[in-house]
């Protein structure tokens, strides 16, 4: 029985980063898929701490909130930096990822048709901080922080991949980010995950946008 269970909708959404992390680290996990119809029946929602998914189980530990789950896996699997300085920088990166993901989710679920063009125009300004951070770490040839992969890398990689679907070419003016995505996506276990039917056949969002 896998030690980890992901309870979530049949989409990539807020779980694909943790799935990539688990796959890359050679961990097995179980998926409990909650259909929209099941969720709309209203019986599961009151049992969830914040009334939302994902729900994550690590043995007898149950967690909610996707970033809390990522940080837990980071601590558990040695993906949280070598010291407090690196850990603090990883937290900063991850919060930056969450800021942009929040903007993306708002676009997808509330204003896709009318807001996409303005969103894409503003996107370079939101991507630039990550390019800057890469440039400050080993010339952008390694990870976002330090010399070992971290939970923040998986979250950033997922964010960049979904934006490449939304706006192909969005990284063309960011050579370090472009190389970073290619480099991480080529890690054998991530490459296998990204080409797996489970990933390929899972839509990014739950409303047919992307």
Swiss-Prot record:
EC class: transferase
Reactions the enzyme catalyzes: RX + glutathione = an S-substituted glutathione + a halide anion + H(+); prostaglandin J2 + glutathione = prostaglandin J2-S-(R)-glutathione; prostaglandin J2 + glutathione = prostaglandin J2-S-(S)-glutathione; prostaglandin A2 + glutathione = prostaglandin A2-S-(S)-glutathione
- In this UniProt entry, the residues modified to N6-acetyllysine are 128
Q: Name one GO cellular component term.
A: protein-containing complex
Acetylation recorded as keyword: yes
* Phosphotyrosine modifications at: 4
Q: Which Pfam families match?
A: GST_C_3 (PF14497), GST_N (PF02798)
Tissue-by-tissue expression: Ubiquitously expressed.
> What GO terms in the biological process aspect are recorded for it?
animal organ regeneration; cellular response to cell-matrix adhesion; cellular response to epidermal growth factor stimulus; cellular response to glucocorticoid stimulus; cellular response to insulin stimulus; cellular response to lipopolysaccharide; common myeloid progenitor cell proliferation; glutathione derivative biosynthetic process
Phosphothreonine is carried by which residues?
Answer: 62
What sections of the protein cross the membrane?
A: none
Q: Which residues carry this modification: N6-succinyllysine?
A: 103, 116
Single GO molecular-function term? Answer: JUN kinase binding
Q: How does it assemble?
A: Homodimer. Interacts with CDK5.
Provide the protein name. Answer: Glutathione S-transferase P 1
Q: Which gene encodes it?
A: Gstp1
